[in-house]
């Protein structure tokens, strides 16, 4: 499973360089997600909002018609609820892309838990640029902080030594960001995609003719990491004997999970998955499983309530 990424530092002025990194003047602040191009994401998001390539598109008609070109704003972003923060450096990148001279101070560490009313970011710069970037920046930080906040709720509810995992149930195109947000909430990443581990599920088992046969096919193909999903206790030993390196226990109740953990006996990691809720995760984790995976972290997280207010300078 992937480890927690480095987080941007506190109280930094940020901008976006040509490599998609967040920077503070001449000092580079690491914000690199393998496989994710920050500069491309920011540009594509702004292009979508501005209607680049569409008839009549390519501009913010409201700001251009109402706000003087040389007007400057001060901006203040704050939390309206208690949240776990994720995505502030990405939000900052939207503003600096449109106004490279914008002064931005990120006040809170990524992954920090903050109460309602906490100042998150301060900005000073071109008013049109702020207004044009506002929605893209807020959408991103609200979405990612919402995921981080829900994830932290599940981590806190576990009350055990088990580790919370996310899943591949992410919005297309946003997987790297959403999985980053779950890490900021205290979870670890499950597979990033179809490429980094085999996960044998019921359809694979049906075609192969059984759990052992499916695992053996993956082993023969040279796959090193083989996660095998089982939904019955009597499938576990067959999966282990065939060489599974991780057993996923699908939709089992706590009694079945305890039995499965005893049978696996620490030979490989065990994972409980399926139908996990805040009210049930403590009992599930108490069975001794290594991991508990929850699709709702990225499927069902509500946006965090984060506001951004501007004042003319």
Residue spans of the language-model regions?
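Intrinsic disorder/low-complexity segments
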Residues: 1-24
